[in-house]
């Protein structure tokens, strides 16, 4: 036999349980090289710079388009 709940889960209990399931907003910053919006601690997808230095072996969006 399958496991069956003893009683119905109320809306309030269900909502309380799901309060931590919401997604957080992304923390965006501006790239210091090209001023586009990027995520923190990530190489810029437009210019390929991270912390003011060009990342080796990274093909940026501008190189792919041309």
From Swiss-Prot:
Record flagged with keyword Cell inner membrane: no
- Give the compositionally biased regions (Basic residues): 1-19
Q: Which InterPro entries match?
A: Ribosomal_bL32, Ribosomal_bL32_bact, Ribosomal_zn-bd
- What is the annotated signal peptide range for this record? none
Q: Name one GO molecular function term.
A: structural constituent of ribosome
For the region Disordered, what residue ranges are annotated? 1-21
A Gene Ontology biological process noted in the UniProt record is: translation
Q: Which Pfam families match?
A: Ribosomal_L32p
- Which key words tag this protein in UniProt? Ribonucleoprotein, Ribosomal protein
- State a GO cellular component annotated for this protein: large ribosomal subunit
Mind telling me which PANTHER family this protein's record contains? 50S RIBOSOMAL PROTEIN L32, LARGE RIBOSOMAL SUBUNIT PROTEIN BL32
Family membership: Belongs to the bacterial ribosomal protein bL32 family.
Can you name this protein? Large ribosomal subunit protein bL32
Species per Swiss-Prot/TrEMBL record: Mycoplasmopsis synoviae (strain 53)
Q: Which gene encodes it?
A: rpmF
């Amino acid at each position: 036999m399958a496991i069956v709940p003893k009683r119905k889960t109320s809306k309030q209990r269900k909502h309380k349980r799901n309060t931590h399931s919401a997604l957080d907003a992304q923390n965006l910053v501006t790239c210091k090289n090209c001023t586009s919006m990027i995520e923190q601690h990530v190489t810029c997808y437009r210019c390929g710079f991270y912390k003011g230095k060009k990342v080796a072996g990274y093909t940026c969006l501008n190189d792919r388009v041309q």
